[in-house]
């Protein structure tokens, strides 16, 4: 049962992906005396990932280097709303989604009015890739390279790239793992 729930409600390529619906399955499996050790361990592992940066919780802070080599952190970004994008410039799907975001008129209007800021974080750590691609993003976006070890320290559940979060002014997660249609609403 857990494998089916995970396949349909957790995997990034599932059209039914919904971590909130997955939570009861994970909690039950993690606590079930009837489940074998593997199922309980798998449920615990996934539960830990799903509970990270859930809607309603404060997003984990991290440090990054900007295009102009300034050290910043997530919580210092002042914005009514912040679209946080974890991406890899060598990921074709990432660049397709970023291109869609750049072309979306509602997002552009909110960005230009100052209601929304976009922080795009390169998480992979390859300095030459970062230097070669950091200026491909629009100038009115904040582009950064992770220096906190987001992936290694599992600060965020980055099960697929790109991963998009929408945060409020207090850095509380409004939406997690959203698609472009959700941003425009």
Give residue spans per PLM region:
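Oxidative protein folding and maturation machinery
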Residues: 1-72
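Short loop/turn microsegments at loop-to-beta-strand junctions
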Residues: 59-60, 82, 161-163
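Short active-site neighborhood of thiol/selenol oxidoreductases, capturing the structured segment around
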Residues: 70-102, 117-121
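Extended hydrophobic-aromatic, low-complexity segments
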Residues: 74, 84, 92-97, 112, ...
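Structural microenvironment flanking redox-active thiols in thiol-disulfide oxidoreductases
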Residues: 96-135, 148-153
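Short, internal strand/loop/helix patches
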Residues: 131-165, 169
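Thiol-/selenol-based redox modules, centered on thioredoxin-like
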Residues: 166-185
């Amino acid at each position: 049962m857990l494998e089916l729930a995970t396949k349909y409600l957790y995997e990034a390529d599932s059209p039914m992906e919904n971590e909130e619906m997955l939570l009861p399955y994970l909690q039950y499996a993690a606590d079930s005396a009837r489940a074998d050790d593997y199922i309980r361990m798998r449920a615990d592992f996934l539960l830990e990932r799903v509970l990270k940066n859930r809607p309603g919780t404060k997003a984990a802070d991290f440090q990054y280097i900007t295009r102009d080599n300034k050290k910043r952190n997530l919580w210092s970004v002042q914005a009514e709303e912040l679209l946080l994008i974890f991406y890899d410039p060598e990921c074709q799907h990432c660049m397709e989604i970023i291109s869609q975001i750049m072309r979306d008129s509602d997002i552009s209007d909110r960005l230009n009015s100052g209601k929304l800021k976009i922080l795009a974080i390169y998480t992979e750590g390859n300095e030459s890739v970062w230097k070669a691609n950091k200026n491909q993003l629009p100038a009115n976006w904040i582009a950064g390279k992770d220096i906190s070890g987001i992936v290694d320290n599992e600060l965020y559940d980055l099960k697929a790239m790109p991963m998009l979060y929408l945060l409020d002014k207090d850095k509380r997660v409004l939406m997690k793992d959203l698609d472009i249609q959700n941003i425009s609403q």
